[in-house]
From Swiss-Prot:
<dbReference type="GO" id="GO:0141025">
    <property type="term" value="P:adhesion of symbiont to host cell surface via host glycoprotein"/>
</dbReference>
<dbReference type="GO" id="GO:0009289">
    <property type="term" value="C:pilus"/>
</dbReference>
<keyword id="KW-0281">Fimbrium</keyword>
<keyword id="KW-0614">Plasmid</keyword>
<keyword id="KW-0732">Signal</keyword>
<feature type="signal peptide">
    <location>
        <begin position="1"/>
        <end position="28"/>
    </location>
</feature>
<protein>
    <recommendedName>
        <fullName>AAF/I fimbrial subunit</fullName>
    </recommendedName>
</protein>
Amino acid sequence: MKTLKNMRRKNLCITLGLVSLLSRGANAALERPPIKATETIRLTVTNDCPVTIATNSPPNVGVSSTTPIIFNATVTTTEQCAKSGARVWLWGTGAANKWVLEHTTNTKQKYTLNPSIDGNSYFQTPGTNAAIYKNVTTRDRVLKASVKVDPKIQVLIPGEYRMILHAGINF
């Protein structure tokens, strides 16, 4: 019995030694060799983020109206673009990017207006530039701005008026 027990121990030792030897050889083969060549992979990501402007204003106003008229604009983008750290912009066509309400046939009849903005938006240069921007987040992807026309001050004549606004997005 003693010899059988010793043989088992010897076989176990031989087996363990062989496994140990093989595993050291396998690990040696898995070591990273020195650098012999280098290649750089390049990826260009383009700004394909959509941006939309939604506006609302009263459809009709009488000449005799003295009630202030509010024009609202909302700029939004997608959630993925917000995750990427996008910044949405809104600006008008007037001097210093102000909003211009202009009569479509009587071009002398126009008013340059300073927009009001929501609390999380900013003017590009407060007091001198009416371009508005907002760093959007997944929770808040909307820039809101508005202008008020006071018919007591900005007298409106019959006809159609227009206001052109632009929106953009960058990072």
